[in-house]
C-alpha cells in the first residue's frame, strides 16, 4: 500500500470498485429484514451545498451500517425538478427550463457520486420526466372520479411578477416569498383536493399524547406543528340576522351573518362584528362608500398568513350596516377588519372586547363599547388595560348574561348552543384551520393538469389512455405569463373526449408539492410503466410490525422547514392511495429525523450608497477582545466591492453565525472541500461536529482536524501492513477461534478498551448519534496507537482484531478509507468487501477484567487506589488495602476498627 494517505487515489479506487460491482443496486429479498431510508429529494439548483452533504451522509451512515448487520437496505435518490426557479433561470439565460434542469441534475449527480454515497441509481427519478408525472395525472383523475379533486372559484394570493397563485404561507409581509412583489387578491378558478376529508385521521395519527397516535417516531416539535396546522376547534356556529338586501333585492346570504366561536359563553358581551374585506356585506357597503372601497383595496395588499395577521396592527372601518344579536335582539354594528380572513370559517367574527385581547385592542382604538360578561373571583375588571384573566375560561363564570349567570365556561357553552338551536340560528360545531389544497398554478414548468376545455361540454378529464399529457420541453418563458397559453403545439389536435369538437388543454399546472407527495413510493417501482406502484412498494413500504396498516418507510430525513406542507401533503397523498387500494399503509414515514442547519460566520458592510454587501469568510479575520470574544472583523485580503477595491485591514461588520446562504456569501462549496481534503473528510466532519438533529457551526480548523484523524488511521494501517498478518487475520475472521488465542495482560487491556467502546458505539448507531460514533472511533485509534507491548502473548491478534473493528465502525462514515485499508491489510480476503462484512460483535470475554481498581479511603477520605483481582474476596481486598503504602501512612500504625468493602467500587479503612 502507499506510504502516505492520498485521498484522491483512495477515493477513486474505491468508487471504481463499487461501480464495477454495481454495489448498491438492490432488489426485493424476502429472506432478509428490509430497511428503507430516504432523504428528501433535492431541487436541482445547480450545486450541492453543505446541508445536502450532511443530510445524505446521515442517510448513508444509517444504511451502510444496517447492510453490515444483515438488512436489505434501500437508499434511492431523485430530483424535485419542476418549479419556478427553473422558469426564472430560463428567463434569465434564454434557454428552456428543461435544458437548465437536466444540466443541473447531471452536475449534482456527479457531486453525489464523488461523495461515495451508497445510492441505488437504477431507481433514479426526476419529477419533470413524463414517465413520472404521468402518475400525478392518473391519480388526479382518480381523485376527480371520487370527488376528492374538484374545481371552484376562490379569492387567492396573486404574485404579479411570477404571475401565479401563492399559498398563504408563501406571502410574507404582504409580499411574494420569492419575488418580494406586493401580493394582490384575485378571484380565479382552480382545482382543489379535499384534504379536509382526512383532517380527523391526519390529526389522530400525529397528535401528541393521543390514543390513536402512530407517528411516535417523529420529533414532538414536528407533530405539534402539524397538530396546530390542522387546528381542530370545538365551539358554536351561529348567525346574526339582518335584512340587508343586495342589488337583486334579496337578503344578502339569506339574511344571516354566520360566525364561529370557541367562547360562546361570552356571547352577551358582543359589541361589534368584523367581516373580511372580501365578505359580501363588506363589498355591498363599499359600493356606496369610496373610503371603504379604498380600505378594502389596501387590505388586499397585506399579509395573509395567520402569523402575520397576529402581529400586524389591527385596522378597520365601520360599514354603517347592523345585524341583530340572536339572543338579545340588540343591533350590532358590522365593521370590516384587516385581520379577518375570508378563507377561514365564514369570513366573519363576533367582537367581544372585554374577553378577547385582539378585540380589546380594536375596541380601544375605535371607541367601541367594552362590556364585561364573565368574572373571576378576586379579580377586578377595568376597561383601561388588558389583563390576561379577562380571557380565562378555566376560572370564569358568567355575569350580566341573563339565564347564563353563574354558569362556568362548559355549561354556559352548552346552554348557549341549546338556546340558539331552539331559534334555528346555531349549533355546536367542530371546525378546522386546515383548508382544501389548491393545486392549480399559473405557470409553465410543472405537471400539466389533465383537463380539456370544450366550449360546449365545459371542463372534461383527459381519458386515461391518453396520458401522459406531455409538457413541451422547448418553451422559453419571456416574462409575459404562462407560455402554455400561447403554445399552439400544446393545444394542437386536442378534441373534446365527449363531443369530438376541437378544444384546448388546461394551461394551469400542478403545485410542485404534488410531485414530492409520493416520489418515495415511486422509487420502489421506478421502472414500472404499467402501474403507479406495485410489488416493490408493497415490499419496501410495508410495516414490519404489522401485517397491514401502520407506517411504511423506515426512516425519512430532511429539514424541519418541511414540517407542515410537504409532510402533511405526503401523509394525505398516502391515505388517498391507500383508499384507492394502491398501498396498504396508513402513513408514509415511520420515523422522521429533521437534521440541523449548517451555520457559518456572516460578514458585511454598508456601501457608500447604503446597500449591504457580504464577504466570504476566507477573506476575513476576527477581532477579539481581552476575553477572547469576537467583537469585529477586518479584511485579510484585498476585495472588490461596490466602492472599489477594499484594502487589507478594512473594518467589516461581524453579524454572528447564520444559515449558509448564497446571498450572504457564507456558504462552503462541497466540491472544493472534497478536492482539497476528500469526501471522507467532508463526511466525517459533518458527522462528528454535532448530533444530527442540532445545528452545525462551521469550523475550518475542525475540518483540518478531521483530515488529520484520517491520516492517523491510514498511517496506522500502513504500520500494520509491515507485520505478518495472515494468521492474525484468520483468527479475527473466525477461520481460527479466538478462544484458542492466549492473550497477555497488555493484549487483554487493549481488547477490553476496544470492546468497551464498541459496545457504546453500537448503542450510538441505534440512536443515530453519529457524533459519538466518531468520537468512539477516535478512542479506538488512541488505544491502538498507545499499544506498545508487541511481544505480549496475543498482541498481534489483539491489534489486528482492534483495527478491524475500528475500520468497520468508521466504514459508514468514511467508506473510501475503510475500503482501502480493509482490502490492503487482508481482511477482505477472509470476510469479503467491507460493505458486506459482518458488523463486529462485542466479545463478552473481552469485557471481563483480570484486575479492577478500587478507591482507597481512610476514615472516609480519598487516599489513593488499589488494584485487586476481579475475583478477589473481601479478605483478599482487606489484605491488599492494609498493605498499601498510602494506607499505612495515614493510619500511622493504628489497628483498624473495621474495613468497609463496597464491591467493585471502594475500600474504606476506619481507625
Swiss-Prot record:
Give the catalytic activity: tRNA(Leu) + L-leucine + ATP = L-leucyl-tRNA(Leu) + AMP + diphosphate
> Where does this protein reside within or beyond the cell?
Cytoplasm
Signal peptide (residue range): none
Q: Would I find Aminoacyl-tRNA synthetase among this entry's keywords?
A: yes
Query: Top EC class per UniProt?
Result: ligase
**Keywords from the UniProt entry:** Aminoacyl-tRNA synthetase, ATP-binding, Cytoplasm, Ligase, Nucleotide-binding, Protein biosynthesis
Position of motif 'KMSKS' region? 659-663
Q: Which GO terms describe its cellular component?
A: cytosol
Q: What is its main location?
A: cytoplasm
The record's annotation in InterPro entries points to:
aa-tRNA-synth_I_CS, aa-tRNA-synth_Ia, Leu-tRNA-ligase, Leu_tRNA-synth_edit, M/V/L/I-tRNA-synth_anticd-bd, Rossmann-like_a/b/a_fold, tRNAsynth_Ia_anticodon-bd, Val/Leu/Ile-tRNA-synth_edit
Task: Kindly name one Pfam family recorded for this protein.
Answer: tRNA-synt_1_2
- EC number(s) on file: 6.1.1.4
Q: Give any GO molecular function from the UniProt entry.
A: leucine-tRNA ligase activity
Q: For the motif 'HIGH' region, what are the positions? A: 42-52
GO BP of this protein:
leucyl-tRNA aminoacylation
Gene3D superfamilies reported in the protein's UniProt record = 2.20.28.290, 3.10.20.590, HUPs (3.40.50.620), Isoleucyl-tRNA Synthetase, Domain 1 (1.10.730.10), Valyl/Leucyl/Isoleucyl-tRNA synthetase, editing domain (3.90.740.10)
Binding annotation for ATP = 662
The entry sums up its family as follows: Belongs to the class-I aminoacyl-tRNA synthetase family.
PANTHER family per the record?
A: LEUCINE--TRNA LIGASE, MITOCHONDRIAL, LEUCYL-TRNA SYNTHETASE
Name of the protein in question: Leucine--tRNA ligase
Which species is this UniProt entry from? Answer: Delftia acidovorans (strain DSM 14801 / SPH-1)
Amino acid at each position: 500500500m502507499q506510504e502516505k494517505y492520498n485521498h484522491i487515489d483512495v477515493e477513486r479506487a474505491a468508487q471504481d470498485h463499487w461501480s464495477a460491482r454495481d454495489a448498491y443496486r438492490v432488489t426485493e429479498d424476502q429472506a432478509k429484514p428490509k430497511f428503507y431510508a430516504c432523504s428528501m429529494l433535492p431541487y436541482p439548483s445547480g450545486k450541492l451545498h453543505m446541508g445536502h452533504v450532511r443530510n445524505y451522509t446521515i442517510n448513508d451512515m444509517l444504511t451502510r451500517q444496517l447492510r453490515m448487520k444483515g438488512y436489505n437496505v434501500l437508499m434511492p435518490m431523485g430530483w424535485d425538478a419542476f418549479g419556478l426557479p427553473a422558469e426564472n433561470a430560463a428567463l434569465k439565460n434564454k434557454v428552456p427550463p428543461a435544458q437548465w434542469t437536466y444540466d443541473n441534475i447531471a452536475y449534482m449527480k456527479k457531486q453525489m457520486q464523488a461523495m461515495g454515497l451508497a445510492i441505488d441509481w437504477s431507481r433514479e427519478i426526476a419529477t419533470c420526466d413524463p414517465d413520472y408525472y404521468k402518475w400525478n395525472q392518473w391519480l388526479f383523475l382518480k381523485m376527480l372520479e371520487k370527488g376528492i379533486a374538484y374545481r371552484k372559484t376562490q379569492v387567492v394570493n396573486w404574485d404579479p411578477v411570477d404571475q401565479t397563485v401563492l399559498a398563504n404561507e408563501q406571502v410574507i409581509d404582504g409580499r411574494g416569498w420569492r419575488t418580494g412583489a406586493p401580493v394582490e387578491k384575485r378571484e380565479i378558478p382552480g382545482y382543489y383536493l379535499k384534504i379536509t376529508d382526512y383532517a380527523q385521521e391526519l390529526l389522530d395519527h400525529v397528535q401528541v399524547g393521543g390514543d390513536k397516535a402512530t407517528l411516535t417516531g417523529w420529533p414532538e416539535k414536528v407533530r405539534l406543528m402539524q397538530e396546530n396546522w390542522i387546528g381542530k376547534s370545538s365551539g358554536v356556529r351561529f348567525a346574526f340576522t339582518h335584512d340587508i338586501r343586495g342589488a337583486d333585492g334579496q337578503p344578502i346570504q339569506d339574511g344571516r351573518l354566520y360566525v364561529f366561536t370557541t367562547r360562546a359563553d361570552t356571547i352577551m358581551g358582543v359589541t361589534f362584528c368584523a367581516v373580511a374585506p372580501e365578505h359580501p356585506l363588506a363589498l355591498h357597503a363599499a359600493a356606496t362608500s369610496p373610503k371603504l372601497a379604498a380600505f378594502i383595496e389596501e387590505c388586499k395588499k397585506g399579509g395573509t398568513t395567520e402569523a402575520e395577521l397576529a402581529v400586524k396592527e389591527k385596522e378597520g372601518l365601520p360599514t354603517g350596516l347592523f345585524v341583530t344579536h340572536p339572543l338579545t335582539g340588540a343591533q350590532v354594528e358590522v365593521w370590516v377588519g384587516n385581520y379577518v380572513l375570508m378563507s377561514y370559517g365564514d369570513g366573519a367574527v363576533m367582537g367581544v372586547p372585554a374577553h378577547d385581547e385582539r378585540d380589546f385592542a380594536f375596541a380601544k382604538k375605535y371607541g367601541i363599547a367594552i362590556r364585561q360578561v364573565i368574572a373571576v373571583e378576586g379579580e377586578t375588571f377595568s376597561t383601561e388595560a388588558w389583563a390576561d384573566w379577562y380571557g380565562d375560561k378555566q376560572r370564569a363564570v358568567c355575569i350580566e348574561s341573563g339565564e347564563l349567570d353563574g354558569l362556568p365556561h362548559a355549561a354556559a357553552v352548552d346552554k348557549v348552543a341549546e338556546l340558539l338551536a331552539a331559534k334555528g340560528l346555531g349549533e355546536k360545531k367542530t371546525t378546522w384551520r386546515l383548508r382544501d389544497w389548491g393545486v392549480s398554478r399559473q405557470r409553465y414548468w410543472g405537471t400539466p393538469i389533465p383537463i380539456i376545455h370544450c366550449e360546449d361540454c365545459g371542463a372534461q378529464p383527459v381519458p386515461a389512455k391518453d396520458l401522459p399529457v406531455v409538457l413541451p420541453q422547448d418553451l422559453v418563458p419571456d416574462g409575459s405569463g404562462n407560455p402554455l397559453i400561447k403554445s399552439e403545439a400544446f393545444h394542437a389536435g386536442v378534441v373534446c373526449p365527449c363531443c369530438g369538437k376541437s378544444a384546448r388543454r388546461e394551461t394551469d399546472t400542478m403545485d410542485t408539492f404534488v410531485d414530492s407527495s409520493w416520489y418515495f413510493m415511486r422509487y420502489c417501482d421506478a421502472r414500472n410503466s404499467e402501474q403507479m406502484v406495485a410489488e416493490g412498494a408493497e415490499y419496501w413500504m410495508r410495516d414490519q410490525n404489522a401485517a397491514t396498516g401502520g407506517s411504511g418507510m423506515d426512516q425519512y430525513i430532511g429539514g424541519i422547514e418541511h414540517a407542515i406542507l410537504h409532510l402533511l401533503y405526503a401523509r394525505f397523498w398516502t391515505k388517498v392511495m391507500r383508499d384507492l387500494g394502491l398501498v396498504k399503509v396508513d402513513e408514509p414515514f415511520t420515523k422522521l429525523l429533521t437534521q440541523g442547519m449548517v451555520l457559518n460566520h456572516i460578514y458585511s458592510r454598508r456601501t457608500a450608497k447604503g446597500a449591504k454587501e457580504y464577504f466570504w469568510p476566507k477573506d476575513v479575520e476576527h477581532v477579539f477582545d481581552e476575553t477572547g470574544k469576537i467583537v469585529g472583523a477586518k479584511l485579510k485580503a484585498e476585495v472588490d466591492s461596490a466602492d472599489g477595491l477594499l484594502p487589507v485591514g478594512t473594518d467589516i461588520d461581524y453579524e454572528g453565525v447564520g444559515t449558509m446562504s448564497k446571498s450572504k456569501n457564507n456558504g462552503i462549496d462541497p466540491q472544493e472541500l472534497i478536492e482539497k481534503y476528500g469526501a471522507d473528510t467532508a463526511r466525517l466532519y459533518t458527522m462528528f461536529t454535532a448530533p444530527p438533529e442540532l445545528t452545525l457551526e462551521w469550523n475550518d480548523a475542525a475540518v483540518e482536524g478531521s483530515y488529520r484523524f484520517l491520516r492517523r488511521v491510514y498511517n496506522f494501517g500502513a504500520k500494520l501492513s509491515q507485520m505478518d498478518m495472515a494468521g492474525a487475520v484468520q483468527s479475527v475472521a473466525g477461520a481460527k477461534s479466538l478462544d484458542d488465542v492466549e492473550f497477555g495482560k497488555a493484549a487483554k487491556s487493549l481488547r477490553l478498551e476496544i470492546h468497551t467502546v464498541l459496545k457504546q458505539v453500537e448503542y450510538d448507531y441505534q440512536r443515530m448519534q453519529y457524533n459519538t460514533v466518531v468520537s468512539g472511533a477516535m478512542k479506538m485509534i488512541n488505544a491502538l496507537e498507545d499499544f506498545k507491548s508487541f511481544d505480549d502473548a496475543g498482541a498481534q491478534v489483539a491489534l489486528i482484531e482492534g483495527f478491524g473493528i475500528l475500520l468497520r465502525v468508521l466504514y459508514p462514515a468514511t467508506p473510501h478509507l475503510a475500503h482501502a485499508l480493509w482490502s490492503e491489510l487482508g481482511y477482505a480476503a477472509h470476510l469479503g468487501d467491507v460493505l458486506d462484512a459482518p458488523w463486529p460483535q462485542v466479545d463478552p470475554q473481552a469485557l471481563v477484567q483480570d484486575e479492577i481498581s478500587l478507591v482507597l479511603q481512610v476514615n472516609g477520605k480519598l487516599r489513593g487506589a488499589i488494584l485487586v483481582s476481579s475475583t478477589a474476596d473481601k479478605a483478599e481486598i482487606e489484605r491488599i488495602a492494609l498493605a498499601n503504602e498510602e494506607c499505612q501512612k495515614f493510619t500511622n500504625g493504628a489497628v483498624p476498627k473495621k474495613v468497609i468493602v463496597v464491591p467493585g467500587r471502594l475500600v474504606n479503612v476506619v481507625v
